[in-house]
A protein has these predicted regions:
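Two-metal-ion RNase H-like nuclease active-site motif
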Residues: 24-37
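Mobile genetic element proteins and their domesticated derivatives, centered on retroelements
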Residues: 33, 46, 50, 79-82, ...
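Active-site beta-loop-alpha junctions of metal-dependent nucleic acid enzymes
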Residues: 52-80
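Conserved beta-strand -> loop -> alpha-helix junction used to position metal-binding or nucleic-acid-contacting
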Residues: 33, 82-131
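Acidic/histidine-rich catalytic cores and adjacent linkers
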Residues: 81-84, 88, 129-311
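Short, basic alpha-helical nucleic acid-contact segments in DNA-binding proteins
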Residues: 10-24
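Short, surface-exposed basic-aromatic patches at helix termini and helix-loop junctions that form
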Residues: 47-49, 69-74, 91-102
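Short, small-residue-biased leader/transition segments that mark boundaries at the very start
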Residues: 2-9
Length: 311
């Protein structure tokens, strides 16, 4: 029957893990981010303005996982990211020539998390306002004016932020305005490393515009993936991971026909066999890892009572 045929086809494709094609194409701008399926299962995703170009299943956003994703993709001119853990260490190793644009919206959110959207202290009101101004900067003159205003804020409130208070519980001195100090230090790191305004560098923009935010992947891809998972509540962790893999695959530039997918893509059995091999043999070194962290694949089928990570 037709229903039986549909179920057979569905079951057959559920056993497949679609892989990202390795094209060797060099992109001007690449966006990267991760979407968590559980506390320690995340799918890292890379895309351009037009297509998804890579994905990788991992335990966490550590440098090893990011390097595995990035190793499949030639270094782009610019990568737009939210500054997740482990990314910079991996970028230095795998994409050493790639410039970084830190998402300005995430930079603003990091400040807002410390000051709240209704800060009580005048220093917090001013810093929150400066962080909010980041979202509207579109030209070099505005960026220079912002840097000057931020430098003036740091000088104006330097003594205030240097105040310390004795913590009665620990007996140690701590910053009196600790949340403001944290917000300032975060912005200081972005400014000192020139990560906020890469999108305005004329040497880079001559090859095409560079977005200042990670909206393409956070709002354009992750939001759709979360909606898909909500619409299909009840899927096992394995099938949620596969659903994301399939969504990413059909949004690559040229997905293979169904017949070719069945011939070339790895199945659950293939990965089980690979995991058995790497459990007894050393890791291969002839190219980038293709599918995901070995422990992730194992835990999708057999939960382990302990946690292991690499970085």
């Amino acid at each position: 029957s037709l229903v039986g045929s549909e179920m057979c086809i569905r079951d057959r494709f559920w056993s497949i893990w679609p892989l990202a094609p390795i094209t060797g194409e060099v992109h001007h701008v690449v966006f990267v981010d991760g979407i968590y399926l559980a506390r320690n299962v995340v799918v890292l995703i890379a895309c351009t303005q037009e297509h998804v170009i890579g994905w990788y299943l991992a335990r966490s956003e550590n440098s090893r996982s990011w390097a595995a994703l990035m190793g499949k993709i030639p270094p782009p001119d610019v990568v737009v990211c939210d500054g997740g853990t482990g990314f910079e260490k991996a970028r230095k190793r795998v994409w050493p020539t790639t410039r970084v644009q830190r998402c300005t919206f995430h930079a603003f959110c990091q400040v807002r998390a410390q000051t709240t959207s209704r800060p009580k202290l005048q220093a917090g009101v001013e810093l929150y306002g400066l962080a909010k101004e980041l979202l509207a900067i579109k030209e070099v003159a505005s960026a220079l004016a912002w840097l000057e205003a931020y430098s003036a804020w740091c000088s104006r409130w330097e003594g205030f932020l240097a105040e310390r208070t004795l913590d009665e519980e620990s007996g140690r001195m701590r910053w009196t305005h600790e949340r403001l100090v944290t917000a300032r230090n975060g912005l200081n790191r972005l400014v000192s490393k020139n990560l906020l305004f890469t999108f305005l560098d004329p040497e880079l923009t001559c090859d095409g515009p560079i977005p200042s935010m990670n909206n393409k992947i956070e709002g354009g891809i992750n939001a759709q993936l979360r909606r898909m998972l909500r619409d299909h509540r009840g899927l096992s962790l394995m099938r949620r991971a596969k659903a994301i893999f399939w969504w990413c695959y059909v949004h690559t530039e040229v997905p293979l026909p169904a017949a070719e997918i069945l011939k070339t893509m790895p199945t659950d059995d293939d990965i089980e066999e690979l995991y058995r091999q790497v459990s007894t043999e050393s890791q291969r070194t002839d190219g980038p890892e293709e599918w995901g962290d070995g422990l992730v694949w194992a835990e999708l089928r057999h939960a382990l009572p302990w946690r292991v990570e690499w970085d």
